[in-house]
Amino acid sequence: MAYTQTATTSALLDTVRGNNSLVNDLAKRRLYDTAVDEFNARDRRPKVNFSKVISEEQTLIATRAYPEFQITFYNTQNAVHSLAGGLRSLELEYLMMQIPYGSLTYDIGGNFASHLFKGRAYVHCCMPNLDVRDIMRHEGQKDSIELYLSRLDRGGKTVPNFQKEAFDRYAEFPEDAVCHNTFQTCEHQPMQQSGKVYAIALHSIYDIPADEFGAALLRKNVHTCYAAFHFSENLLLEDSYVNLDEINACFSRDGDKLTFSFASESTLNYCHSFSNILKYVCKTYFPASNREVYMKEFLVTRVNTWFCKFSRIDTFLLYKGVAHKSVDSEQFYTAMEDAWHYKKTLAMCNSERILLEDSSSVNYWFPKMRDMVIIPLFDISLETSKRSRKEVLVSKDFVFTVLNHIRTYQAKALTYANVLSFVESIRSRVIINGVTARSEWDVDKSLLQSLSMTFFLHTKLAVLKDDLLISKFSLGSKTVCQHVWDEISLAFGNAFPSVKERLLNKKLIRAAGDALEIKVPDLYITFHDRLVAEYKSSVDMPALDIRKRMEETEVMYNALSELSVLRESDKFDVDVFSQMCKSLEVDPMTAAKVIVAVMSNESGLTLTFERPTEANVAQALQDQEKASEGALVVTSREVEEPSMKGSMARGELQLAGFAGDHPESSYSRNEEIESLEQFHMATADSLIRKQMSSIVYTGPIKVQQMKNFIDSLVASLSAAVSNLVKILKDTAAIDLETRQKFGVLDVASRKWLIKPTAKSHAWGVVETHARKYHVALLEYDEQGIVTCDDWRRVAVSSESVVYSDMAKLRTLRRLLRDGEPHVSNAKVVLVDGVPGCGKTKEILSRVNFDEDLILVPGKQAAEMIRRRANSSGIIVATKDNVRTVDSFMMNFGKTTRCQFKRLFIDEGLMLHTGCVNFLVAMSLCDVAYVYGDTQQIPYINRVSGFPYPAHFSKLEVDEVETRRTTLRCPADVTHYLNRRYEGFVVSTSSVKKSVSQEMVSGAAVINPISKPLHGKILTFTQSDKEALLSRGYSEVHTVHEVQGETYSDVSLVRLTPTPISIIAGDSPHVLVALSRHTCSLKYYTVVMDPLVSIIRDLEKLSSYLLDMYKVDAGIQXQLQIDSVFKGSNLFVAAPKTGDISDMQFYYDKCLPGNSTMMNNFDAVTMRLTDISLNVKDCILDMSKSVAAPKDQIKPLIPMVRTAAEMPRQTGLLENLVAMIKRNFNAPELSGIIDIENTASLVVDKFFDSYLLKEKRKPNKNVSLFSRESLNRWLEKQERVTIGQLADFDFVDLPAVDQYRHMIKAQPKQKLDTSIQTEYPALQTIVYHSKKINAIFGPLFSELTRQLLDSVDSSRFLFFTRKTPAQIEDFFGDLDSHVPMDVLELDISKYDKSQNEFHCAVEYEIWRRLGFEDFLGEVWKQGHRKTTLKDYTAGIKTCIWYQRKSGDVTTFIGNTVIIAACLASMLRMEKIIKGAFCGDDSLLYFPKGCEFPDIQHSVNLMWNFEAKLFKKQYGYFCGRYIIHHDRGCIVYYDPLKLISKLGAKHIKDWEHLEEFRRSLCDVAVSLNNCAYYTQLDDAVWEVHKTAPPGSFVYKSLVKYLSDKVLFRSLFINGSSC
């Protein structure tokens, strides 16, 4: 990975050096982004401050050794062994990183002050005073704590929050933080510690005997111990002195005493036992008990420090196969001594144990051994004659360089002196090309003489071997030893006359070859350790319990799934969100839903900040009164009248606060009108705000818009005053463009330092001699502005809105009620018209000047309307009924008329939506017509930094009227308008082509002499406008300024060559610019831009095409009809092929394992075996527990093996199991519901969603209970049923709360594999007597008929009394080209989940359909608390509510309940198709519709366990709905057909033929094989193992269509 990053960076750098500037910029940006990402990643690492002074090389050592940390080197503290001391803190943090945060930790010999500073309240330090140095170190730690606290006191600070818990623990219970016992004897007892215990040992393990370490850890129940200590591999080579170069320290060994010290400085040394340290290094197992052991594992070595961990191991978890019987020798001898009089065999038996054995090996690497050899050195004492031999490591290259060279010496030259001379010369220097250079071998010079002796002896021996080899091992009369000593005597002469005798006595000659051998050392040394433990029992390996964390994770993932709908959700900080929920103890799902609701503006709350930074969120959440630092005051505080003068006096300017809604339709205005003169000489600071708007807006959207409008005035006023103050503070630094907008008057000299372009300013900002700034109302005399003595300068602005904003704020503040704006109940109608559609003309034609009011944005528009309205000579339009918006707001309450009937706002969409809401409320009108253009320039927020959320820009209206005929625009512009507007735009203009363009070479070309411009001159920007005015052009305006105006000819000019964002293909400014003229428009531009492309395209249009947009008069009405789709299925007859094995194969692939279940005797097994049932209160007649014997008729045996069950026999146990499954243990999922009111709301949605508008009210003229309805009901009954009514007098009703209970003999097959693990309970029938059905049956039959007649059958299907062909017709107009979401709601335990709320919904539906109140109350009581009696099985019980499976309303009741349930949660007005049948439902919605959390809503309101599935094809009532490009076809489920072919209840061949005919009726569509491929896809959606099934569909058709062939699917059971 590192190589890849390096290669990528190098490639990018090479790219940057190229000549392509674009590629260079991209590469530089990539490098920048990579660097930012890398620094951000480093920023997330734990931070460690390294204060000690170290060198640059040491800085690099620390950084590379600990990449897990972000280390900051301050170099502010000189200290002894500064690197090692600084690394101590890094080593501690590295050890603590290995431990889960918050787990109880023992720091053996640790620094408790370090843990306090880190805020670790879960660490206990064992710090025994083993010597005086330990006492000194402990006192130093306490001193550091006192120093830290004194610094906090001196700075007036308190202990930070993250440290507080740890310091409190040390202050109240110091023994919990630190004790002065050894770890082996520590008495600390943790309080309420449920997690695992850990330990760390930082350079303290030396002082704990290795044999006691395991037991000490077990006594504290330590799970894992992490340790760090200094060591060097060279100590294993028995070196007496070892350097630790990186930290500049050393080890020296003297026997078992090992001393650690720092070189090049005077500091205390540390002494330890070498044998004890060696045990920690070389051992692997540290026994803790006869069962548990701690196993050591090395982790890493960093800067001469070894890190390891000791893990607690339970030997009983070992696989029992590793245990074997063996004899424990110690136990054997003990037994023999204690019981010698017993037999030896008995002693052997007593000593026999089952032992567990394990072994380990550790390799130690010696990097310094590489390219080294071991050389023996010899010495002998002349005084004591004692010889000695030692070994040293010498460079392999050096050794063999010397040996190879001296091997070339002649026999006479091969002397010790010559060898020593050569060795010393190459050690001191080496000659390269005649130049002497420093030797490359750094051999200790003190060893050169001894090395030379070894080299000399080694060479002599080698010469001898060569001679022996040459002579073919024939040595004559001399032995090898004699040859050796002859050579030695010849070389040394008489130097050592007695050496030979001594060596002979010591028998050295025999080992001469071995003694002189040069060995190559191993790079690794292996240490072995063995564990032997007694096997007593075997324990299963426990699993880690992470259920709680996974549950929390599941909740968090669900919350994040909820948040995924937000924009830029991929950048959502999950860690911050999780920490927030944890710290505030908030449910993540609740928090997520609140966030989504707020961000999607569905909560009645608006957050105005764009980015949820810490500052913004803090401002949103903090107390508003505390947040008002001189400027912010929430108007919702309890004051009777908000006073602007009081606010100014306090130095405050109020913002709109929190929401409340007052629906009254009139104002009670304050009679005391504040005057603007009261704010003369108010301080500028009281108007300048740091915060642009309220952070939070609450209340209905209109209220939020109105509050935002108030804040926009405050922000505009603040910006204007702030700019004038800035001008006064720095007059000399004003640029040329700013000088054209502002003016500064020097009061002393009465001269304009900056002369303004306009005159007679009403307001300005005054700077006094005390350098104070005030807002002043300016007055004039013949000398100009009237000034005061303490004034120094006066600043004015030609764009200043101080006067108007203050006046509007004064008005709006007086209209607030307890700080809340009032929303009018008037009807608001938006008239959306294309440019030039005659909006002003329409206003004049509709207005009644005696009772209506017209408001327009500008003065020119107001004067134009007055002029046109009074053109006949009669004055009807005055300044009272035709006004500008600013005038109406500023002077509100000063005129005689305060209430108007209708309000007309021209160009209302150019206003702030909150302003429009205020205007409607202030006019007290009944209807407000807002004329505007949704595609032209909207309201533009011109205050930088002021938030105007996107949803605030949408005006809330009650109706929208469109005008799509333009009276102004020529045909070519009309063609462009059709691209921008919905609906067909036409024009009454006779001009066809009107637009043109001209590219000019530069801005200097545009001047009145060389380039006179025809007609009205327009620009896009103010800078272009000022440039044209300065060159002598007159009457120049921007496009924004002339919106709503009409000119015959227009010259549109662009002088700015840089990109302008408002010139784009879909820009509203372009639309306004193209639609101002009636005859011609010419565009002059210095650059090619999108508008040039648009004009060129319009120039190319043919006249024939433009004629299509021309009409003689405006269109009064347009009839719009939606497209209708109706198709027919393609029919391709299915070939009749296949065999029984095809059906069996397909069934086994879809439902693997079902066909292998031998379930013929399941019912018998259940009766004969013990069974435990959980039942509610019921009465059982045990005399019915044994069913009466019946003659068994052997049914036909199916050849297709399915999960079909044998018919069951009614009995106490069978019926009780069915009752438990179908009626007992009803789920209780719903929350607290206002049943009556909620049911009424649900039924409202039901009627609005499904019923035709004209049939939503019942026909009271039709009687539900009549002879005709009774006859219709009787026609559907069997004769047996009618016979039961022969003795019924219809005078009184039987008990309506009494039901009978029975079961169906045949279990229902499920199309899943549950049969393999469950005993399928039978379906129950709970039914009334026929006497009750005779009363209510006709009633509900008539109610059902009325309901079905009222349903919008084009979109909804209530599947009652429908044939499969009718289902196909209903879905036949589905258009497969329209993207759709196919929804299925799957509800389990549907009948028994229905409670009082479901009954209330159903009764309310019947009541609104005309159900008579008395009978309705009787029916309601009969379904509240009901008694069930099963006379056959002897069972009696009581149930509340629930759906009765044999009731007269079972099917239609279930159908309306599922429909009402879905209508209460989904927006049915958007639905394409919907079908309901019992508990089945199928919905088709347009693609992309948003759906609520169905499961949550169904649980809480409807008490249903439900899941909502999105599919490609629908599945409804056992049929697949296959929509295609020609319509729709309905296929019966082929798997369900095959399941039925395995039926085991067919009595005889006649019964079989009836069975075949019924299957043929439902499966007739399988004869059409045109859509088998789509059917395969639909089946695969439900059964993922299903193969393509065309072969089995054809097989089904083959057998179903031939009654003779169909008989082959069964065999006669009586013959078997």
Curated annotation (Swiss-Prot):
GO biological process: DNA-templated transcription; mRNA modification; RNA processing; symbiont-mediated suppression of host innate immune response; viral RNA genome replication
Limits of the Alphavirus-like MT domain: 72-281
Domain named (+)RNA virus helicase ATP-binding: residues: 801-963
Residues of the RdRp catalytic domain: 1380-1493
Record has Nucleotide-binding as a keyword: yes
CDD domains: Virgaviridae_RdRp
Taxonomic superkingdom: Viruses
Annotated positions binding ATP: 833-840
Ranges of residues in domain (+)RNA virus helicase C-terminal: 964-1116
GO molecular function: ATP binding; ATP hydrolysis activity; mRNA methyltransferase activity; RNA binding; RNA helicase activity; RNA-directed RNA polymerase activity
Signal peptide per UniProt: none
Alphabetically ordered keywords of this record: ATP-binding, Helicase, Host-virus interaction, Hydrolase, Inhibition of host innate immune response by virus, Nucleotide-binding, Nucleotidyltransferase, RNA suppression of termination, RNA-directed RNA polymerase, Suppressor of RNA silencing, Transferase, Viral immunoevasion, Viral RNA replication
EC number: 2.1.1.-, 2.7.7.-, 2.7.7.48, 3.6.4.13
Pfam family, one: Vmethyltransf
Residues covered by region (Helicase): 830-1085
Catalytic activity: RNA(n) + a ribonucleoside 5'-triphosphate = RNA(n+1) + diphosphate; ATP + H2O = ADP + phosphate + H(+)
The keyword Transferase is assigned to this record: yes
Location of region: Methyltransferase: 50-458
PROSITE patterns: ALPHAVIRUS_MT, PSRV_HELICASE, RDRP_SSRNA_POS
Something else known: This protein is translated as a fusion protein by episodic readthrough of a termination codon. When readthrough of the amber terminator codon TAG occurs between the codons for Gln-1116 and Gln-1118, this results in the addition of the RdRp region to the replicase.
Family: Belongs to the ssRNA positive-strand viruses RNA-directed RNA polymerase family.
Subunit structure: Heterodimer of a large and a small subunit.
Name of the featured protein: Replicase large subunit
Lineage: Viruses, Riboviria, Orthornavirae, Kitrinoviricota, Alsuviricetes
